[in-house]
Amino acid sequence: MTDIIVTQTLNTIGLRCPEPIMLLRKKIRHMQEGETLLILADDPATTRDIPSFCQFMDHNLLKSDLENTPFKYWIKKGK
């Protein structure tokens, strides 16, 4: 896989559900189609919530790193 070029970062470390998803929704709304967002999170609920959010909102979850905290998610904004 080629290197992912991150255009925005969202740090949700220390926040618990539903705050990470609320901030993700707000942040991605102000991004341009095709931009990539890196999310840092330590809430275990994000391992379920972020992939579901991406599928529901038609964004592309490019990669996730769930081995250690903080969890990392790379999301490419869809239409």
Swiss-Prot record:
Q: What family does this chain come from, according to its entry?
A: Belongs to the sulfur carrier protein TusA family.
UniProt entry keywords in alphabetical sequence: Cytoplasm
Cross-referenced Gene3D superfamilies, in alphabetical order?
TusA-like domain
Q: Name one Pfam family in it.
A: TusA
Q: Which protein are we looking at? A: Sulfur carrier protein TusA
> SUPFAM superfamilies, per this entry?
SirA-like
Q: Which GO terms describe its cellular component?
A: cytoplasm
Key word Cytoplasm present: yes
The family database entries (InterPro entries) matched by this protein are listed as:
Sulphur_carrier_TusA, TusA-like, TusA-like_sf
Q: What does this protein do?
A: Sulfur carrier protein which probably makes part of a sulfur-relay system.
Tell me yes or no: is Cytoplasm among this UniProt entry's keywords. Answer: yes
Cystine pairs: none
- Coiled-coil intervals, chain numbering: none
Organism of provenance? Histophilus somni (strain 129Pt)
